Amino acid sequence: MTLLALGINHKTAPVSLRERVTFSPDTLDQALDSLLAQPMVQGGVVLSTCNRTELYLSVEEQDNLQEALIRWLCDYHNLNEDDLRNSLYWHQDNDAVSHLMRVASGLDSLVLGEPQILGQVKKAFADSQKGHLNASALERMFQKSFSVAKRVRTETDIGASAVSVAFAACTLARQIFESLSTVTVLLVGAGETIELVARHLREHKVQKMIIANRTRERAQALADEVGAEVISLSDIDARLQDADIIISSTASPLPIIGKGMVERALKSRRNQPMLLVDIAVPRDVEPEVGKLANAYLYSVDDLQSIISHNLAQRQAAAVEAETIVEQEASEFMAWLRAQGASETIREYRSQSEQIRDELTTKALSALQQGGDAQAILQDLAWKLTNRLIHAPTKSLQQAARDGDDERLNILRDSLGLE
């Protein structure tokens, strides 16, 4: 059994590729079923966010394993293998464990130390438990990563400053508009990222917020908290002209805001500028919008320059966190190796007990037939000894014949011989 982590993220692939490799919530179960149908896959977890798509797998080793999994991923998303191969990373066993721990701790995020990723990893794990996990080692790896993430956040200052994609989006808005108190902001979506954006905006005295979402109930709860108006996604076209700032983050597989929609809004606004911040993957705003005069479109990748200014104080904490991850990953792999030994021990004990029961049954039968008790017991002891030492004796003899002193010493040590 081998543990694997493979995928792409914001460091290896542009948003144009990442949006083609995402797994939407609506198709996740189907994807997991398809993944587990692969003969080499024992269990799997799919993590798909705006910045990464990753598969965490427990697999049986086989020839061309990497090729088979890349082919599955490309076939599922109708991708050319060459388009994906150069952006794909592949981690195995200890490296896979370390990678997951780093991801869960925010050490591999676009925003170093951001806390939202832990919730996303936990959700991915929970989704996989609906009949798709099927591997105790994989489950233990995820549970361990959660405790490591908690330890990193508790024992280091990795989360000391309020830095996130949501924070960066608000920072961008404050850089472009002198005061946010007089602008109208349209938020598209009502997920965790938009919740954070809404709270940041409220802290910066935004008076007018509109939340557009597919389900009104979720949006209404957030609107009640931040004092916003709620509209449906179908109302965006009519209300876009009211917004000075649009920040969008949904799980829609297709763009929600098109070039024509923005053109109409700009005309109604008499070309008063609009800021559009698209932090969704796949993108919510058609890229062509960025070519329009007075429409200033930023994607999640464009936020990197803003985010980089807020990282300095987290670098020292990241070094401490990496040490914790290295230690915890090493301990996990030691536990995993011990599980392999435990199975061997169980098999050896079962084999020995089977020999014991077989010979004891024969001895009891002989006693019941009136045989000499002392002779029967001596015969039992002799046969039991010979049967139990038969396999170790053959291994010792073979090691001696091969001149394999290292193996001979290991066998002597295993048998308790000085």
UniProtKB/Swiss-Prot annotation:
> What would be an example GO MF term here?
NADP binding
At the top level, the lineage of the source is Bacteria
**Active site (UniProt):** C50
Sorted UniProt keywords:
NADP, Oxidoreductase, Porphyrin biosynthesis
E.C. no: 1.2.1.70
Q: Which reaction does it catalyse?
A: (S)-4-amino-5-oxopentanoate + tRNA(Glu) + NADP(+) = L-glutamyl-tRNA(Glu) + NADPH + H(+)
The record's section on Gene3D superfamilies has:
Glutamyl-tRNA reductase, N-terminal domain, NAD(P)-binding Rossmann-like Domain
Q: Write out the GO biological process terms.
A: protoporphyrinogen IX biosynthetic process from glutamate
| Pathway assigned to this chain's UniProt record | Porphyrin-containing compound metabolism; protoporphyrin-IX biosynthesis; 5-aminolevulinate from L-glutamyl-tRNA(Glu): step 1/2
Q: What class of enzyme is it?
A: oxidoreductase
Q: Which PROSITE patterns does the record cross-reference, listed alphabetically?
A: GLUTR
Q: Which residues bind substrate?
A: T49, C50, N51, R52, S109, E114, P115, Q116, Q120
Please state which protein family the record places this protein in.
Belongs to the glutamyl-tRNA reductase family.
Oligomer status and interactors = Homodimer.
The UniProt function text for this chain reads: Catalyzes the NADPH-dependent reduction of glutamyl-tRNA(Glu) to glutamate 1-semialdehyde (GSA).
Please quote what the entry notes about the protein's domains. Possesses an unusual extended V-shaped dimeric structure with each monomer consisting of three distinct domains arranged along a curved 'spinal' alpha-helix. The N-terminal catalytic domain specifically recognizes the glutamate moiety of the substrate. The second domain is the NADPH-binding domain, and the third C-terminal domain is responsible for dimerization.
Kindly give the PANTHER family that the UniProt entry links to this protein.
GLUTAMYL-TRNA REDUCTASE
**Which additional comment does the entry carry?**
During catalysis, the active site Cys acts as a nucleophile attacking the alpha-carbonyl group of tRNA-bound glutamate with the formation of a thioester intermediate between enzyme and glutamate, and the concomitant release of tRNA(Glu). The thioester intermediate is finally reduced by direct hydride transfer from NADPH, to form the product GSA.
Q: What is this protein called?
A: Glutamyl-tRNA reductase
UniProt gene name: hemA
